[in-house]
């Protein structure tokens, strides 16, 4: 029996597990006050990460799915998604299926880039005290990413692209 099954039980282990980077779980200690995530925003990033199965396919849970999984209202999900997009941690991509508007897809690459920056700054440890200088550097990378990115002009991977009606 695997360690996962030993720890959680066979029936739970058979249903699968999500891979969530530790740096994502600890992200707030690396961000300044302006960029600190609310509990809802962090939970949404965890849920998006758990729905992101393949690198070249963006996750696309609906607002109502995210609301149910997070135990918050759809409006709270919308506000959280807007803020995550505005600070440059995710990108939102509109989708259509057979000409009908479908749930948004979410580009996780900006989050990957921020977590890589954090990992480069702290390759061998999980610090308890992060210097203000490091926090400023990481947070300013968010501001730089936000300034560079075009609003909602992200390209869907070919495997997820849908035909416009």
Which stretches of residues belong to each language-model region?
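Serine/proline-rich low-complexity intrinsically disordered segments, especially terminal tails, linkers
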Residues: 64, 72, 105, 133, ...
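Short recognition helix of helix-turn-helix/winged-helix DNA-binding domains
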Residues: 1-76
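Small/flexible residues
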Residues: 9, 17, 49, 56, ...
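Charged low-complexity intrinsically disordered patches
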Residues: 2-15, 86, 110-165
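Generic alpha-helical propensity signal that fires on short helical segments
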Residues: 55-57, 62, 90, 108, ...
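Residue-identity detector for threonine
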Residues: 36, 50, 65, 100, ...
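Winged-helix/helix-turn-helix nucleic-acid-interaction surface
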Residues: 73-123
